[in-house]
């Protein structure tokens, strides 16, 4: 079994994710092979909160060019985690 810290890679800080925080929704970059149940358990264990729902999406890597050479960034998975109403906020995102 994977460690929760291997499943949740990093938070995604963007204008859209900051607006979702008002509704107790947080956006994370997660392991590409993780499923919703693993993501839910990892968030609950790391941040000591109750998760209401988890939405995941696979993000395709962009094609980037460097002069005549072209390459592709890696594909990755994004998870939007909604917390229950009585759950505390994730402190990591406060003050952003």
Swiss-Prot record:
Part of the 50S ribosomal subunit. Contacts protein L29, and trigger factor when it is bound to the ribosome. It comes from Finegoldia magna (strain ATCC 29328 / DSM 20472 / WAL 2508). Keywords: Ribonucleoprotein, Ribosomal protein, RNA-binding, rRNA-binding. The keyword Protease does not apply. PANTHER family: 60S RIBOSOMAL PROTEIN L23A. This is Large ribosomal subunit protein uL23. It holds the Pfam family Ribosomal_L23. InterPro entries: Nucleotide-bd_a/b_plait_sf, Ribosomal_uL23-like, Ribosomal_uL23/eL15/eS24_sf. The gene is rplW. Disulfide bonds: none annotated. One of its GO terms (biological process) is translation. One of the early assembly proteins it binds 23S rRNA. One of the proteins that surrounds the polypeptide exit tunnel on the outside of the ribosome. Forms the main docking site for trigger factor binding to the ribosome.
